[in-house]
Regions:
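Conserved N-terminal phosphate-binding loop of PLP-dependent enzymes in the Aspartate aminotransferase
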Residues: 1-151
Length: 151
């Protein structure tokens, strides 16, 4: 079923070759377009841009505080939105990467304490959702703290 305004109907009535290309998975499918519009409305309603900036600052500052606490943290990267990475090293001066077993310990203990984090080589990657709350960030930072404390 399709609903069209009078002006659109006239185009089709006056031109037998007129058509609306839709139904493709990659271009202008009405259902996909409706979903995209609904997402934009929710993005504005939930203030995700402002939230991501505030929570990103919170995570970055929290990870920098952890770096002061643990020598195993060689660097904290991010500070521009929510994505943050923690470089794990066995020697800060040489930046020698941490061994895989220690990285796994940090990840597993963080998980046991309520945070699912990703390890990629010697890096702990944080990429929480845009709707993450201040309390969620506190839990995440506490769980990561526990992970580093276990090493």
């Amino acid at each position: 079923a399709l609903m069209l305004g009078h002006r659109m109907v006239e185009v089709f009535e006056n031109n037998p070759n007129a058509k609306i290309g839709h139904g493709y998975t990659y271009s202008g499918h009405p259902v996909g377009a409706a979903a995209a519009l609904a997402c934009l409305v929710e993005t504005k309603r939930l203030n995700v841009i402002e939230n991501a900036a505030a929570r990103g600052d919170q995570l970055f500052a929290g990870c920098q505080a952890l770096m002061e606490k643990y020598d195993i943290i060689g660097d904290v990267r991010g500070g521009h939105g929510l994505m943050t990475a923690i470089e794990m090293v066995s020697d800060r001066a040489t930046k020698k990467p941490i061994d895989a077993a220690t990285a796994t310990t940090v990840q597993e203990v963080a998980y046991q304490n309520g945070a699912m984090v990703r390890v990629s080589g010697p890096n702990l990657i944080l990429s929480p959702p845009l709707v993450v709350t201040e309390n969620d960030c506190n839990i995440l930072l506490s769980a990561i703290d526990a992970g580093f404390a276990a090493t």
